[in-house]
A protein has these predicted regions:
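N-terminal export leaders
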Residues: 3-7
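Bacterial N-terminal signal peptides
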Residues: 9-20
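N-terminal edge beta-strand
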Residues: 29-61
Length: 151
């Protein structure tokens, strides 16, 4: 009887994907597509923007596929954990951008020239994150959006 119970328990673990080693199977990474756009893209866009899809993903590894559709401008994507009050974001009027040494920056795509793409992976915990382009003038021109990470 005891042996049968052990066999049934082992079969249950196998069917649940928890054996061998009793480690649950890895969850696939979430994928977020990010389009960097501005008026030079020629799609009737009248402002700068980061277009993100989807706006919510599960916690864990997140893969960002970033594409710059601009014809003229280099853009970037920073993933930041924002402060409680956005009004307290450290902004340099002289540099016309956020002061990166004073923000909680989790990832930086570097600069994508017009037509370039880039992929980056970031491990994110549940919470709200701000995706921004911090090239001079771009953050204030609207190149920012939110990403929600759930359990």
């Amino acid at each position: 009887m005891k042996r049968r119970s052990l066999l049934l328990a082992a079969a249950g673990l196998l069917s649940a994907g928890l054996a061998p080693g009793l480690i649950p199977p890895a969850r696939a990474a979430s994928v977020v597509n990010v389009i960097q756009e501005d008026p030079s893209a020629g799609h009737g866009i009248k402002h700068m923007a980061l277009v993100v899809s989807p706006h919510a993903v599960k916690a864990g590894e997140v893969v960002f596929h970033i594409r710059n559709i601009s014809k003229d401008l280099t853009h970037e994507v920073l993933v930041i954990k924002p402060p409680a009050k956005l009004s307290s974001m450290p902004y340099s009027k002289k540099q016309n951008r956020l002061i990166e040494s004073r923000i909680d920056k989790l990832a930086d795509s570097g600069g994508q020239k017009p037509g370039q793409s880039y992929t980056m992976k970031v491990d994110l915990k549940p919470g709200k994150y701000l995706l921004i382009c911090n090239r001079p003038g771009h953050y204030r021109a609207g190149m920012r959006t939110w990403l929600t990470v759930t359990h």
